[in-house]
Amino acid sequence: NIAIAAKSTSENPKIPGTIFSACDQLKLAGGQALPLACDIRFDDQVEQAISKTAQAFGGIDILINNASAIDLRDISDLDMKRFDLMHQINARGAYLCAKLALPYLKQSTNPHILTLSPPLDLNPKWFAPNLGYSIAKYGMSLVTLGLARDLGKRGIAVNSLWPETAIATAAVTNLLGGEAVIKYCRKPEIVADAAHLILTRLAQGNTGNFYI
């Protein structure tokens, strides 16, 4: 049983697929899927999406924080509107989703929170020139670090997952060099397989990790 909550309710030529087409694929694979139109910047929409998920499936066992905004421009070119957007979606979004899902996760027998964010590495090479994006993305990792400490005693696993190489997605094609970069990327399925491995482990004691 999977709920997909996102803004993508209509086709975008640059980013193929919608919450509806993704749910259709899940159903074809034999699963139950619930598409939920949701803008992660707005608390009420996230709260409604989480509530509908719990009502539809009888609870929530797993939260995956995959929503992310990316803009790799440097400080001279990155406008504050885009800077704020990345922080609203990335760090704040991960924190908000965890906060609102927590009452349901507490009732699960094997609760997990998995966030797509990098290991915390303060080497300056990860901050320049894309400082705005790095701060926002590392904010998601700080959510993992803090919640793992806070929720571990409650038996809730909180971990992050990050690919060692770029992944062949629409974002990579549009922002990181187009088709020329894709040939050096891994397929998205490798991330899905890694997530499945993490989320099928016992939550107790399996927390605070930054998996690569």
Describe the predicted segments one by one.
Residues 1-57, 70-71:
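Short-chain dehydrogenase/reductase
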Residues 49, 64, 97-101, 105, ...:
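Hydrophobic positions on the long internal alpha-helix
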